[in-house]
From Swiss-Prot:
One Pfam family linked to the record: Pyr_redox_2
Enzyme class: oxidoreductase
Subunit structure: Homodimer.
Entry protein name: Ferredoxin--NADP reductase
PANTHER family, per the entry: THIOREDOXIN REDUCTASE 1-RELATED-RELATED
InterPro entries: FAD/NAD-bd_sf, FAD/NAD-binding_dom, Fd--NADP_Rdtase_type_2, Ferredoxin-NADP_redctase_2
Keyword terms, alphabetized: FAD, Flavoprotein, NADP, Oxidoreductase
Keyword NADP: yes
Species: Orientia tsutsugamushi (strain Ikeda) (Rickettsia tsutsugamushi)
Amino acid sequence: MLSKNVHTTDVVIVGAGPVGLFAVFQAGMLEMKCHVVDALDCIGGQCVTLYPDKPIYDIPAYPVITAAELIEQLKQQSAPFDTVYHLGQQVIGCKIDNDMITITTSAEQVICAKSLIIAAGCGAFKYKRLTLDNIEAFENKTVFYSVKDKNKFINKKVVIAGGGDSAIDWTLLLSDVAEVIYLVHRRENFRCAPHSLNQIKKLAECGKVQMIVPYQLAKLTGENGLLQEVLVTNFDGGAQTLPADYLLAFFGLAADLGPIHKWGLKTDLRRIEVNSITYETTIPGIYAIGDVASYPGKLKLILTGFAEAATAMSHCYQRVFGKKMHFQYSTVKGVLRS
């Protein structure tokens, strides 16, 4: 008899973001049992932890959908299938014996499966924090590295620091609720979509956004964690004091594959190299899909990850059942719903 912390299934999916959730659906459609492991304590990955209110425009049939809404739809889509989730757990070990893959989690759960799919996005991530004096007093009170509720910033003075897509996108998204936004970047050039930057410049013309370039953060002033002013300086010795209720710093993520690095997989710049036809890694039975997968011509899009999930799962079917999958359209097969 198996211990309560030992499980046997057909497929293990590491990562419960959008691509991992669609892989769950694909497994269910092929009548494969599935366990999912994610280091976060909730389903949704970066979509719910980093940018739940951020609009996504390139999901087919949805002219626009927020990241949180997309995750909710994917959860509903995969709900009919009896999937087991192990949340708040990291995969710390992986062994292969007689074509059976056995993983161990940080919560001492042991899962045995014929196939393993890594849909871990950019891996475990941490925000690149500010190094200003006394920053700890303001963090998670009036200084944030992500936005979970845009309503917090209604009629507030907001300083946004950064020059990439996240800084630009959140400037656009908060411009309709904030009193004013100060966009601070140490360079005059931004690393973002030209269309988005043009929108920022139009907002600057009407006073909703003030572009503070080339400047960088120098000092925060406030009491009891409540921000009052942000001092910014440039390389010529110039300085400005910006009145502020909140500071949002978007300097990117420090990503790490964590223990996956020790599995013997071939990696390339924190991504896992795969066969571009099956998405199998250099270890048979282990696949990688979504942003973590690397192959020539790769497009880092959620849509691409969905297609990779379908292909990888069909290949898993052959390992699980020992026979080639008989392809059926979902319109023929259907999905049983309670």
